[in-house]
Amino acid sequence: MSRLDKSKVINSALELLNEVGIEGLTTRKLAQKLGVEQPTLYWHVKNKRALLDALAIEMLDRHHTHFCPLEGESWQDFLRNNAKSFRCALLSHRDGAKVHLGTRPTEKQYETLENQLAFLCQQGFSLENALYALSAVGHFTLGCVLEDQEHQVAKEERETPTTDSMPPLLRQAIELFDHQGAEPAFLFGLELIICGLEKQLKCESGS
């Protein structure tokens, strides 16, 4: 049996997450999957919260590819691309949004967040509004993915409701959403946030 290290623990935990979801993910089940005694895991993850924090970081490291603005990128495009990349990372694993809930920046992420704030401040945002802009986009993205992933679970567990008895506009709206999926609604909301931030920035600058 190969030596157990944190990388192997995290990889196995992500596999288990996809199999059983966040509610079924326990250190006991993870230990069984790894073929070790549960106390052995405590050398690598102290408890489930520590495990979830580690999984959240791993998802971002693997799938979030647009942390910082590219050279010449506008702040609007940066926020768009950052949000899309964050969404992809959350969708990369079952219950990805739930895993990310309640996490806090790690020391490894400090420089990235500092660069994001500095970039927005250079574009004319106050520090306060730069913080709120990043928070608004991040929380919106997280909420959209959380709803999307929960909707998929609920859809599998309940009978598909008939739309025959619904009023016509509601029926068309539901059929449209079911056909298009969640991404168009996410992109629409993201653009509304960015438009609002543009207006706020103009008010701040007096233009």
UniProtKB/Swiss-Prot annotation:
PROSITE patterns: HTH_TETR_1 (PS01081), HTH_TETR_2 (PS50977). InterPro entries: DNA-bd_HTH_TetR-type_CS, Homeodomain-like_sf, HTH-type_TetR-like_transc_reg, HTH_TetR, Repressor_TetR_C, Tet_transcr_reg_TetR, Tet_transcr_reg_TetR-rel_C_sf. GO terms for molecular function: DNA-binding transcription factor activity; metal ion binding; transcription cis-regulatory region binding. Tetracycline binds at residues 64, 82. Residues 26-45 bind DNA. NCBIfam families: PRK13756.1 (NF010319). Mg(2+) binds at residue 100. It comes from Escherichia coli. Residues 3-63 form the HTH tetR-type domain. One of its GO terms (biological process) is negative regulation of DNA-templated transcription. Pfam families: TetR_C_1, TetR_N. TetR is the repressor of the tetracycline resistance element; its N-terminal region forms a helix-turn-helix structure and binds DNA. Binding of tetracycline to TetR reduces the repressor affinity for the tetracycline resistance gene (tetA) promoter operator sites. This is Tetracycline repressor protein class B from transposon Tn10. Changing residue 64 to Y: 1000-fold reduction of affinity for tetracycline. Keywords: Antibiotic resistance, DNA-binding, Magnesium, Metal-binding, Repressor, Transcription, Transcription regulation, Transposable element. It comes from the Bacteria.
